[in-house]
């Protein structure tokens, strides 16, 4: 059963109705509309914590979606699910695929940096100081890229870059 038929949340239901109306009036092909329906249902399932269901919808959306930017967003959302479930390697793979298709996704760059930072912390805890620092350097590279795209975001990352000496003065110019 499509998620649109079993959603009891008024806001989600309203969004679904509006999205359906927009889909009907937009001059786009049937395949693109169907891809959006699966993507929308994936977002709805993800918001409800139904991650396995969300991944199924996203996988189906990927088979139908032709627009590279939209495919990037689908992969990004899939990465969010894997990251929240602790599968950081799979999340990294999906985030990298997302920015390959849609380089204007600072949120994916940020999430890559967060994972590298986390892995750096773990490496240091395990006694691998050099490995941890290398992972911190990777995190810094991705945060700098994200901040260049969205300079008013990622304030904590900006502070970390400054306090660790990983940000040059002209990084945003």
UniProtKB/Swiss-Prot annotation:
Keywords: Membrane, Photosynthesis, Repeat, Thylakoid, TPR repeat. GO terms for biological process: photosynthesis. PROSITE patterns: TPR (PS50005), TPR_REGION (PS50293). It is a peripheral membrane protein. TPR repeats lie at residues 35-68, 72-105, 120-153. Gene3D superfamilies: Tetratricopeptide repeat domain (1.25.40.10). SUPFAM superfamilies: TPR-like (SSF48452). It is found in: Cellular thylakoid membrane. InterPro entries: PSI_Ycf3_assembly (IPR022818), TPR-like_helical_dom_sf (IPR011990), TPR_rpt (IPR019734), Ycf3/AcsC/BcsC/TPR_MFPF (IPR051685). It comes from the Bacteria. GO terms for cellular component: plasma membrane-derived thylakoid membrane. Belongs to the Ycf3 family. PANTHER family: CELLULOSE SYNTHASE OPERON PROTEIN C, TPR REPEAT-CONTAINING PROTEIN MJ0263. Essential for the assembly of the photosystem I (PSI) complex. May act as a chaperone-like factor to guide the assembly of the PSI subunits. This is Photosystem I assembly protein Ycf3. The gene is ycf3.
